[in-house]
Structures are given as C-alpha cells and as structure tokens.
From Swiss-Prot:
Residue sites binding heme b b566 per the record: H97, H196
Effect of mutating I39V: In strain: Isolate #5800
Protein name: Cytochrome b
Alphabetical list of CDD domains matching this protein: cytochrome_b_C, Cytochrome_b_N
Signal peptide segment: none
Cofactor: heme b
Cofactor note: Binds 2 heme b groups non-covalently.
Bilayer-spanning residue ranges: 33-53, 77-98, 113-133, 178-198, 226-246, 288-308, 320-340, 347-367
InterPro entries assigned: Cyt_b/b6_C (IPR005798), Cyt_b/b6_C_sf (IPR036150), Cyt_b/b6_N (IPR005797), Cytb/b6-like_sf (IPR027387), Cytochrome_b (IPR030689), Cytochrome_b_C_euk/bac (IPR048260), Cytochrome_b_N_euk/bac (IPR048259), Di-haem_cyt_TM (IPR016174)
Naturally occurring in which organism (per UniProt): Sorex shinto
Length: 379
C-alpha cells in the first residue's frame, strides 16, 4: 500500500512542502527565519483574534477597552503583551530574513524576492494600523503625522488624506477603518506567504555558498524540522522573557496617556522597527522628497536583483562586499538610533549622512565593488 501522505490530495501538498522536500545539505541557521516568521504570523493572528473579541473600535471606548483587556479579562495582559511584543519579534525575524537574502544572493529568485518585498510592505502597513488601535497619545499623533504625509502627493494629496481619515481629522471613522484593515491584512499576508513558498519551491532553496546544490540534497524532515523546532523554542524563550519581565521595554510611555488632539507630544516617533525609515523621511527638508525617500527606502530592495554585477551569487567568497554589507547594517542601526532622537544638531546631519550612505551603498558602491571583485579574480 502506498503511503497516505504521498497519495492524499491535501497531505501530498504538505508532504512535498515540509516532509519530502529536497533541501540543500549545507543551509545554516540563517535559513531558520522563514519558519520563525510563519510562527510569528500564527502567534499574531491567534492573539489578535482574542484581543478583537474584547476590543471596541470607537474613540470613546478604545483606550478603556484595552485597559479592560489588561485588568479584567483572564490572561488579557498576557495576550495583549504577546501581541505587542510579538510584532517586535516579527520585525526582528523579518530584518534578519531580508539581511540573509541580501548577503547570500537569495534575491536572484526574482518572483520569491518580489513577493517578499510586497510582504514587507503589507506587514509594515498592518503594524502601523495596529499601533493606532489602543488610541493613546502616540497612536493618535503617529496616525495624524504619517497619514498626513500623503498630502504631499501633487493635486490629489489633500483629498486622499481626507478620504483615508473619513473626515477632516483622525477620528472615529479613521479608527474603525484601521481596525477593519488591521484585522483583514494578516490573512492576506498569510496568503501571500503561501505564494512566497510556492515560488520558492519552484526553484528550491539557495544555500550559503550560492552554488547549485542539486547534486547534494537531503529530505526536509527530519533534518530541518528538528532544526526549525530549535529555532522556534529559542524564539518563544525570547518572546516570553520579554513579555513576562519587561513588556513595555520596546513601547512608548506616551501611549499610556489617552489620545488628546489638543496636546501634541514633544517627540512624535513610531515604534522602533520603523525608526530607520522615519529617520530617512526626516532627513529631507522637503515634504514630497521625504515621502519618496521613505517609500524608496523599502522599494530599493526590489531593484537589488538588477544591480547584481558579481559573477558569484553569494557574498561568502567576496570579502570586500562583506565589509560593505556590514557597513550597511551599521548604517541602518545608526538610522534607527537617529529616528528616535529629537530634530536638533548633531542628529540632523548624522541622519542626512546616514540616509545618503544607505542609498549610495545599495545603488552605487556595492555593484561597483562587485565588478572590482570580478576583475580581482581575473574572470
């Protein structure tokens, strides 16, 4: 009798994706983040579902409903902080996953990479709208400032902003629609993640060497299932430690104050995972220019495959490109730090220099260095 997992219409899909999938024998722990992102998404959808059961998307009661969840609902505080810090873990895994893709040349799988960029935008949009829902000071002013950026779009800008707000300011209509979108988007993200995997399994995984691994494949189960379980346990350890010991470490104290349209917080800033893009936005004095730079800071990832000039796929054997990659990482950390600082000297000039370096590295310096490395090998 043939094995059921190989014949059953549903089970054979799972089998070919997670059990009998031929995987390269040398993929490192940097390849764990895909499964970790899947776990993060599941955690976010489940905790979000339970939060939505008690949350009310009305400006009068949103803040108190979140307080009610934390005080009166059984383990409501745990669900709320798992959801809030789960978002941070999600973004940590996302950034490491994208960084892995850049380092090892995984972006050469064009369809997979482009769906990934789309996923990044979708997750960022979801996180932004989720941050507005508790209706604290930073929720309200963050929503006001970020949505207002769309008014920089010529001709249709101001109409577009009022259309998104559902009125002349961020109010009840805005909160209700943000809740609706925040609820539906994770399911769209899950569907996109399925497409992401579909395209990945068309080509098979890349590996650290960047070389073709067709001659040396091993089954996904048990080797990488066990490896992924270790990653998941470590993720849960970090997440639960964060939630149970310092749940507010990554949050903003201003969000414990009810939203007040008449009182602007001294420093409006988004969650830590948006600070690098926020720093790029602020580094340009022109409003439209800042918005374009903000979008391009993520969209530039879609251009990376077309700027690949090296004859080797991975950076494993390219020391100069490796140095530039780690300079890029340091630059992004600098931008993240700058995004959380007030707009004053010397932070303004540091932010501007870091923003210029960010785009220069990706668009100019790294492709030229790759050409230089080709010549170095006399290829």
């Amino acid at each position: 009798m043939t094995n059921l997992r190989k014949t059953h219409p549903l089970m054979k899909i799972i089998n070919s994706s997670f059990i009998d999938l031929p995987a390269p024998s040398n993929i490192s722990s940097w390849w764990n983040f895909g499964s970790l992102l899947g776990i993060c998404l599941i955690i976010q959808i489940l905790t979000g579902l339970f939060l939505a059961m008690h949350y009310t998307s009305d400006t009068m009661t949103a803040f108190s409903s979140v307080t009610h969840i934390c005080r009166d609902v059984n383990y409501g505080w745990l669900i709320r902080y798992l959801h809030a810090n789960g978002a941070s873990m999600f973004f940590i895994c996302l950034f490491l996953h994208v960084g892995r893709g850049l380092y090892y040349g995984s972006y050469m799988y064009l369809e997979t990479w482009n769906i990934g960029v789309l996923l990044l935008f979708a997750v960022m949009a979801t996180a932004f709208m989720g941050y507005v829902l508790p209706w604290g000071q930073m929720s309200f002013w963050g929503a006001t400032v970020i949505t207002n950026l769309l008014s920089a779009i010529p001709y249709i800008g101001s109409d577009l902003v009022e259309w998104i707000w559902g009125g002349f300011s961020v109010d009840k209509a805005t909160l209700t629609r943000f809740f609706a979108f925040h609820f539906i988007l994770p399911f769209i993200i899950a569907a996109l993640a399925g497409v992401h995997l579909l395209f990945l399994h068309e080509t098979g995984s890349n590996n650290p060497s960047g070389l073709c691994s067709d001659a040396d494949k091993i089954p996904f189960h048990p080797y990488y299932t066990i490896k992924d379980i270790l990653g998941v346990l470590l993720l849960i350890l970090v997440l639960t430690s964060l939630v149970l010991f310092s749940p507010d470490l990554l949050g903003d104290p201003d969000n414990y104050t009810l939203a007040n349209p008449l009182n602007t917080p001294p420093h409006i800033k988004p969650e830590w995972y948006f600070l690098f893009a926020y720093a790029i936005l602020r580094s340009i004095p022109n409003k439209l220019g800042g918005v374009l730079a903000l979008v391009l800071s993520i969209l530039v990832l879609a251009v990376v495959p077309f700027l690949h000039t090296s004859k080797q796929r991975s950076m494993m054997f390219r020391p100069f490109s490796q140095c530039l990659f780690w300079i890029l990482v340091a630059d992004l950390l600098t931008l993240t730090w700058i995004g959380g600082q007030p707009v004053e000297h010397p932070f303004i000039i540091i932010g501007q220099l870091a923003s210029i370096l960010y785009f220069l590295l990706i668009l100019v310096i790294m492709p030229i260095t790759s050409l230089f490395e080709n010549n170095l090998l006399k290829w």
